[in-house]
Structures are given as structure tokens and as C-alpha cells.
Amino acid sequence: MEFSSKLIEKAVNEMSQLPGIGKRTALRLVLHLLKQPKEQTGFLSQALLNMREDIKFCENCHNISDTKVCEICANSVRNHQTICVVEDIRDVMAIENTGQYKGIYHVLGGKISPIEGVGPSQLNISSLVEKVKSGKVVEIIFALSSTMEGDTTNFYIYKQIAESEIIISTIARGISVGDELEYADEITLGRSILHRVPFEKTFKNN
Amino acid sequence: MEFSSKLIEKAVNEMSQLPGIGKRTALRLVLHLLKQPKEQTGFLSQALLNMREDIKFCENCHNISDTKVCEICANSVRNHQTICVVEDIRDVMAIENTGQYKGIYHVLGGKISPIEGVGPSQLNISSLVEKVKSGKVVEIIFALSSTMEGDTTNFYIYKQIAESEIIISTIARGISVGDELEYADEITLGRSILHRVPFEKTFKNN
């Protein structure tokens, strides 16, 4: 792509570094900004800069937060003895949206993935193990996505905390609510049969 | 969507103002920036700001340019008597890529579109009419996309310059090179029959 303007070229090049945004899309976005008032570009740049400079991570659960300890960890009503292990802030948001979880979280910041060069030392695993060893934790819930990397990470952590006398659970895998059985893949359907739950549980409150 | 951080929320809100980028995509992009070195966010913000602040438009053809007169208009080898009328810089880039055009351009900056509230006065039409009336132009080539808005814009300009003694042409519509006839729509196929060209022209150079 040849540009008639170095300024446009530079903006497009920087924009197309973002995942899923190619040169063409980047050019479309940049031209859109050109048509909008100057302030919009100013607001966007400033918001990104502020976010990148001032962002903090909760020193307890490592979630993204504006304060030293995030709102969830600072909430004394929540059950601090149950820790849900997730990959990143998006998973926290997804679980919070269900309104079904009253414990706290531990954000790993990724999954063990040799292909992408992510090893255990780059993730917030040691602080989780320490928490468990401190004896204040009653249950750990693994809520990583059910991929090769997720399972590897689960197992890596499990090996380090298996000797502690705590409950270690993982979120249930099974047929989505509202799904037809015939379209489910075999592994999911198989798991949902193996891990069947007492029928009474499905209509009684816990 | 509820965010645990106002900084993230603001960045996501600004990002999702861009066309085709929803809140979820914006969050993905913002989290990507968080994982990259701080410099990348700095470069991106700076490139966008510089682009928006310092961008110039060629005073002759209104194309985006870093200088007062763009490279194409400043090039004395090009034929300044032939003007190709296009919508924006993307069309200039597309035509330049063909390597088939040696004239200069006139960038309208959009198409007449009552639905989007774009009238003739918001486009660079009057300066085009002036150029034609100055008598230095021999041919005008309309190269707007073949939509209702494009045709309206073509016709609006045509009405104002029809009395000048210049050649007014429009780019050929027809079956794409490499396309099968049976899959072409009727209107395009019809046009390509009506506007058939002497066979000799297709293998002789001009």
C-alpha cells in the first residue's frame, strides 16, 4: 500500500499493529477520525495513554483495578475463602454478570502456552500457591477455558496445591442451556453424562 | 458491560466510537495494548494525534497530503488537462495502483447523500466547476462508485459543466476480468453489452 501522506502511513501502521486490524481496516478507521472533530482523536489518544500509564493491578487478585485493592477483594460481604481462578478481566466480568458467584477471584493473566512462549513464571501462579498454603482458603475453583492450554494450566496448579487440605473444583462442562443434544459434540456430551448431577439439584436452590 | 476500572471503561468507550468496533472488540484491543510495552500505546496515540493535527489537503485536488500541493499535482510529467473525479484518498490509491492513469485527480471528499445529510455544498464540487470553466481542462473522468449516491453526484456535476466544450467520460462498467458470465448480475452484463468496445482495442496498446 502506498500512501500520499507520511502522517497517514504512520497512523495506519500503528493502528494495524492491533490484533484483527489489517492495513485496509486501519485506513478506514484513520479516515473516519479525519472526518470527525479533532477533539475525538484527542479524547481517544488521551484515554489510551491514561489507561496504559495509570492502570493498576489489584495486589490481592491481580485483576485490573484503579485502586491498590480491587472492589471485589475489598468487599467484606464476599466469601474470601473461595477463590475462582480465571485467565483475565474478561472472565471476571463474565462470571460477575451471572450474579451466581459470591467468592473472590485470582487472575492468572494468561494460560501456560509453550507455543506462544508463555511459561508458568510469567503467570500469577506462585502468589496463588502461597495463598493456599497460608491456610485461609477453603475452596479453589478452576474456571479457565477448556482448551489444551487451559487444562495444562489447571493441572500445573493442581500439582502444587494437591497436598493442601482444600476443595479443588472446576466449573462444570456440559450441554449449554437451550441447546439440542443432537448438535452437541461427543466430548461435551460424554462429559455431561459422566458428570451428571442429582435431578433435585436442578430445581432446588442449591 | 460493567468494568472494574474507570480507565479501562473510558478507553473502551472511546475505542468503540470507531466504525465497526463494538465494546467487546474494543476491550480486546485495549487489553492487547496492556500486554504490550508502554511505548506501543505511546506511538499509537502520538501517530493519531500528529495525523489529525498536521494533516493537510492539497489545495489543487483536495487529496490528503503532507505538503501544500500533493505529489501527483506537483508532478509536471503528468497530464494536467485530464482530471479524474473520485470520492476519497482510497480511490486515488486504488487507481494509482493500476499504473494505467497519467492524469491528475479531484477528490470530492464524499458523495451527495441526503440520507447521511451530505449535500453538494459539503463536497469539493465548486472548485471542480471553476477548474473546468478556467478552460485548462480537456477531459473529466467520473470514477465514483456505481451506487445511487455516486450516480446522483455524477449527474449533479455533469449538469454544471455540460455546457463547457470538454470531454466528459465515466469509467467503464462491465464484467470483471476473470469472471464467469453466468454469475454476473443482469444490469452489469447488460451494460457491458451496450458499451461494447472494438475487439482490436483489447489487444492493441490504446
Swiss-Prot record, chains A, B:
Family annotation (CDD domains): TOPRIM_recR
Any matching Pfam family: RecR_HhH
GO MF assignments: DNA binding; zinc ion binding
Family: Belongs to the RecR family.
Domain Toprim: 81-176
Coiled-coil regions listed: none
SUPFAM superfamilies named among the record's database cross-references: Recombination protein RecR
InterPro entries, per database record: DNA_Rcmb_RecR (IPR000093), Rcmb_RecR (IPR023627), Rcmb_RecR_Znf (IPR015967), TOPRIM_dom (IPR006171), TOPRIM_RecR (IPR034137)
GO biological process, one term: DNA recombination
Annotated organism of origin: Flavobacterium johnsoniae (strain ATCC 17061 / DSM 2064 / JCM 8514 / BCRC 14874 / CCUG 350202 / NBRC 14942 / NCIMB 11054 / UW101)
This protein's UniProt keywords: DNA damage, DNA recombination, DNA repair, Metal-binding, Zinc, Zinc-finger
Signal peptide bounds: none
Chain's role: May play a role in DNA repair. It seems to be involved in an RecBC-independent recombinational process of DNA repair. It may act with RecF and RecO.
Zn-finger segments (C4-type): 58-73
Superkingdom of origin organism: Bacteria
Protein name: Recombination protein RecR
